Swiss-Prot record:
Keywords: DNA replication. Required for the timely initiation of chromosomal replication via direct interactions with the DnaA initiator protein. One of its GO terms (molecular function) is carbohydrate derivative binding. The keyword Heme does not apply. This is DnaA initiator-associating protein DiaA. GO terms for biological process: carbohydrate derivative metabolic process; DNA replication. Homotetramer; dimer of dimers. Residues 34-196 form the SIS domain. Belongs to the SIS family. DiaA subfamily. PROSITE patterns: SIS.
Length: 196
C-alpha cells in the first residue's frame, strides 16, 4: 500500500512537470480571453460533470467571491450548480441538453464558456460548446487524453488547455491547478496590487 501511495504522488508530480512545460502559453491565452471578456462587460459561463463540475463551481465561486485577495466580484456562472434547472431540462429533453439550453439562454456574444471535460467527449459539454459557437462566445476548454470531440469544435479564437496525461485522476488534479492558475492570472491582471 505504501508503494502505491508513492506511485500516485510520483505520477502527479510527473504530470505537473510535463504540464509546466507544455501549458503556460495555452493557460495564458485562456486567461487573456477571460480578462478581455470581463473588461468588455461580459461574463464567464462554466460547466463540467463530476469532478469537472466541482472545478467549474470552484472557478465561479473564486470569481464571484474572491480567489486569494479581496477584490470586486466578477461575473461567472457555474451552469452545473442549479439542480432544479438541470433536472428540469433533463426531464423534458435529452440529458445532453442540460448545459446547451442554459448557454442559449444566458450566453451572449463576447462571453466566455469554460468547458471542462476530462476526455473531451461528454455529450452535454460538446453540446454546450456547439451552442456557445452559435452565440459567438469564446471557448476555453480544459481537456485531457487526446482532447476528444471537444478539441475538434474549437476555432482559432478558442483555447484548448489539454493536460498531457492519459490518467483521469491526474488530469482532474491538473484541471484544478489550471483553474487556480486562471484565477490567479485574472486577479493579477485586473487588480495587480491587491496581493501586495
Amino acid at each position: 500500500m505504501l508503494d502505491r501511495i508513492k506511485v500516485c504522488f510520483t505520477e502527479s508530480i510527473q504530470t505537473q512537470i510535463a504540464a509546466a512545460e507544455a501549458l503556460p502559453d495555452a493557460i495564458s491565452r485562456g486567461a487573456i480571453a477571460m480578462v478581455q471578456s470581463l473588461l468588455n462587460g461580459n461574463k464567464i459561463l462554466c460547466c463540467g460533470n463530476g469532478t469537472s463540475a466541482a472545478n467549474s463551481q470552484h472557478f465561479a465561486a473564486s470569481m464571484i467571491n474572491r480567489f486569494e485577495a479581496e477584490r470586486p466580484s466578477l461575473p461567472a456562472i457555474a451552469l452545473n450548480a442549479d439542480n432544479v434547472v438541470l433536472t428540469a431540462i433533463a426531464n423534458d429533453r435529452l440529458h445532453e441538453e442540460i448545459y446547451a439550453k442554459q448557454v442559449r439562454a444566458l450566453g451572449q456574444a463576447g462571453d466566455v464558456l469554460l468547458a471542462i471535460s476530462t476526455r473531451g467527449n461528454s455529450r452535454d459539454i460538446v453540446k454546450a460548446v456547439e451552442s456557445a459557437v452559435t452565440r459567438d462566445m469564446t471557448i476555453v476548454a480544459l481537456t485531457g487524453y487526446d482532447g476528444g470531440e471537444l478539441a475538434g469544435l474549437l476555432g482559432p479564437q478558442d483555447v484548448e488547455i489539454r493536460i498531457p496525461s492519459h490518467r483521469s485522476a491526474r488530469i482532474q488534479e491538473m484541471h484544478m491547478l489550471t483553474v487556480n492558475c486562471l484565477c490567479d492570472l485574472i486577479d493579477n491582471t485586473l487588480f495587480p496590487h491587491q496581493n501586495d
